[in-house]
Amino acid sequence: MIRDGDVLLFQGDSITNAFRMPNEINDAYRLGAGYVFLIAARLRALRPHAGIRIENRGVSGDSLSRLRARWHEDCLAIRPTLLSILVGINNTAAGVDLEADARDAEAFEQEYDDLLVLTRKSLPKVRFVLCEPFLLPAGEVTDDRIRAIALRQGAVRRLAARHHAVFVPFQRVLADA
């Protein structure tokens, strides 16, 4: 999946951001203290001469719309060969009625699809990794919130299939942990 010379770009919200300090040179700060740094550390340990470039452009609080607003500068200009996206939790509107939330989830799926189509058009050889948004049993996790995120999880799963992307089922993995 990861090839020598690849440019890996991680996009998403606070989970991806993980307190990154983008102006730092050292990966321990530049990539944040989360999964992006762990992946980078492992790759560099296992393949130190592979020439793999790793970038983190996660922004805390990002929704899909905010991600899209910065897409040209924070994705297309970087020209990734492998693009990982984790977004969706900040697109949930827990506490709204089921019909409204279903409409919001449909709009989320369409906007996400448009973003992937735009990316593929600009970067025909890019490979996608689509990560499922997830909820942890922390804070107030209501049935409405679970339902809202489940709609977006289904959307990301469908998009991964449609765009021949790797799908990362975070919710199941975390539930099984």
Model-derived regions: residue spans:
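Alpha-helical cap/lid subdomain in secreted, periplasmic
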Residues: I2-D4, A33, L38-R53, D62, ...
